[in-house]
């Protein structure tokens, strides 16, 4: 039997890309879901087993209120930005993430929740050999462009590992690279895929690509990311991180080629090297999660097709 069936599950960041995917999945698992939103659109789902509440998780009292009667926490509330936003909001990316996360960890442990699921970030890894393993997280400083957010994510990882030793709460942690899918931030602050999809949808030609197009990234479809987190919570809720993804690397130029192929046009590419771009190469070693028995259901193209279909239906 699923560990989620008939359990009271709290999902923070429920209006975001990961949160909405998790809400849908938990309802299918027959859980009783309390979805926490802040100031974005509320969850699009309506269900007898779904309660949507508004809360500011930077306020400890709000965290105390939402944790009541909860068995499992899936914590996705986060302040996230793409390449340009990471340069513009370096302080906010630390403070607006660490305070709500520590608050939720604190109230979860103090209320003896059974499981706590957390998505960490590959920005915590140093710029070392690739593909990078989980054991290498502290083998050097984070990439200079990720210094603030990288150390913040490392801190949260250590807090989780410490809290794992305190009481019965069990922690599941996964580390993806570039998450994409329906309900992403399709705006100025979004990550690469939403911005590229918007350009392709508008028929941009020549097609503007930030940087040289040679940056190497691994992408993971959001439903696969949520599935991996739930899998780790069931199989090894030890607080130790698991890298997750397809294990397939893609350059930004290859990504744009795939997106424009789906839109059935062939624009010329214009590489704007004056625009912000981040680390030139980042690959995760996914051997550990593979050995645990998990693998993703979507390759990049099938995930992009689902994402583009959703965007065209909802823009």
Give the residues covered by each predicted segment:
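N-terminal Rossmann NAD(P)H-binding glycine-rich loop of SDR-like oxidoreductase domains
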Residues: 7-29
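SDR active-site strand-loop-helix element
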Residues: 12, 36, 73-79, 116-122, ...
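Conserved glycine-rich Rossmann-like NAD(P)H-binding loop of the short-chain dehydrogenase/reductase
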Residues: 31-40
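NAD(P)H-binding glycine-rich loop region in Rossmannoid oxidoreductase-like domains
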Residues: 54-96, 110
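Conserved Rossmann-fold NAD(P)-dependent oxidoreductase catalytic core, especially the SDR/UDP-sugar
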Residues: 75, 102-146, 172
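Short alpha-helix in the Rossmann-fold core of NAD(P)-dependent oxidoreductases
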Residues: 93-101, 117, 152-153
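NAD(P)-dependent short-chain dehydrogenase/reductase
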Residues: 128-131, 154, 159-234, 247-249, ...
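C-terminal substrate-binding subdomain of Rossmann-fold SDR/epimerase-dehydratase oxidoreductases
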Residues: 202-315
């Amino acid at each position: 039997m699923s560990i989620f069936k008939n359990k009271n599950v709290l999902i923070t960041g429920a209006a975001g890309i990961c949160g909405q995917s998790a809400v849908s999945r938990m309802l299918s698992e027959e859980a009783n879901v309390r979805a926490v939103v802040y100031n974005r659109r509320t969850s699009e789902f309506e269900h007898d087993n779904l309660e949507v509440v508004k809360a500011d998780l930077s306020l400890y009292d709000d965290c105390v209120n939402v944790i009541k009667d909860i068995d499992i926490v899936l914590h996705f509330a986060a302040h996230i930005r793409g390449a340009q936003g990471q340069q513009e909001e370096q302080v906010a990316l630390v403070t607006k993430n660490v305070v709500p996360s520590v608050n939720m960890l604190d109230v979860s442990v103090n209320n003896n929740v059974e499981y706590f699921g957390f998505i960490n970030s590959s920005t915590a890894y140093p710029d070392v050999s690739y593909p990078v393993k989980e054991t290498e997280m502290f083998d050097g400083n984070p990439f200079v462009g990720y210094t603030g957010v990288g150390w913040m994510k490392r801190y949260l990882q250590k807090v989780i590992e410490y809290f794992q030793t305190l009481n019965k709460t069990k922690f599941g942690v996964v580390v993806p690279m570039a998450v994409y899918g329906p309900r992403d931030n399709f705006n100025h602050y979004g990550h690469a895929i939403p911005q590229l999809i918007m350009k392709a949808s508008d028929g941009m030609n020549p097609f503007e690509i930030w940087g040289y197009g040679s940056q190497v990234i691994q992408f993971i479809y959001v439903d696969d990311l949520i599935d991996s987190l739930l899998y780790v919570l069931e199989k090894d809720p030890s607080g130790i991180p698991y890298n997750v993804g397809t294990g397939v690397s893609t350059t930004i130029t290859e990504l744009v080629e795939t997106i424009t192929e789906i839109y059935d046009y062939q624009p010329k590419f214009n590489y704007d090297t004056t625009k912000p771009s981040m680390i030139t190469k980042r690959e995760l070693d996914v051997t550990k999660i593979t050995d645990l028995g998990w693998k993703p259901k979507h390759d990049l193209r099938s995930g992009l097709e689902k994402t583009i279909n959703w965007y065209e239906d909802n823009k």
